[in-house]
Amino acid sequence: MTQKNGPLRVGIGGPVGSGKTTLTEKLCKAMRDKYSVAVITNDIYTQEDALILARRQALSEDRIIGVETGGCPHTAIREDASINLQAVVEMTRRFPDLDVVFIESGGDNLAATFSPDLADLTLYVISVCQGEEIPRKGGPGITRSDFLVINKSDLAPYVHVDLEVMEADAMRMRAKRPFGFTDLHRGKGVQEIIDFIVENGGLEPRSN
């Protein structure tokens, strides 16, 4: 079902190496049979993430647009999101029945946020490999994203991270905003994120 005001736009942010592209891939593969899905990726000088998603066959290539932001990638999702908004318009032109567009930011820091004009829902991805203290460092991505993804939970024993500490810190920093632990490589935790997107984005599976 196409949204009344256009497709649902889901922003996916997080530091380099946290698992943004893997999350985007898993979401596309899990949702593409029930919804009309597209992706817009952001890289500074290349379209590498778009190429990765195409190689992994997350979606057909015509459903993936790679945006080269140049300079600071934060600007393209926040202060001046016009290049991404244009990509959304182009994707909607290609697929008038589009239900959801995932907009993956370039690698960013804890201060990066999506403009509300660009994203209806925001997911922020961090990795346990960044350290146990990451949730309590705060920043808009940690405290204000609609759903915080704490990825690579399977590696916690190897990087000496206590997941219970991370959980307690995330609960304290985010108040009642949801978060979840994932092992995206194995697909663990993906369904919880999908359920969140469907419920909070008002998506309804298209009838066959």
Curated annotation (Swiss-Prot):
The UniProt keyword set, sorted, is: Chaperone, Cytoplasm, GTP-binding, Nickel insertion, Nucleotide-binding, Virulence
Q: Which InterPro entries match?
A: CobW/HypB/UreG_nucleotide-bd, P-loop_NTPase, UreG
Query: Mainly localized where?
Result: cytoplasm
Give one GO biological process term. Answer: urea catabolic process
Binding annotation for GTP:
14-21
Keyword Cytoplasm on entry:
yes
Extract the GO molecular function terms from the UniProt entry: GTP binding; GTPase activity; nickel cation binding
Q: Where in the cell is it found?
A: Cytoplasm
Output the Gene Ontology cellular-component terms. Answer: cytoplasm
- One Pfam family named in its UniProt record: cobW
Query: What is this protein's function?
Result: Facilitates the functional incorporation of the urease nickel metallocenter. This process requires GTP hydrolysis, probably effectuated by UreG.
Looking up PANTHER family in the UniProt record yields:
UREASE ACCESSORY PROTEIN G
Subunit text: Homodimer. UreD, UreF and UreG form a complex that acts as a GTP-hydrolysis-dependent molecular chaperone, activating the urease apoprotein by helping to assemble the nickel containing metallocenter of UreC. The UreE protein probably delivers the nickel.
Its family remark reads:
Belongs to the SIMIBI class G3E GTPase family. UreG subfamily.
Q: What is this protein called?
A: Urease accessory protein UreG 1
Q: Which organism is it from?
A: Brucella abortus (strain 2308)
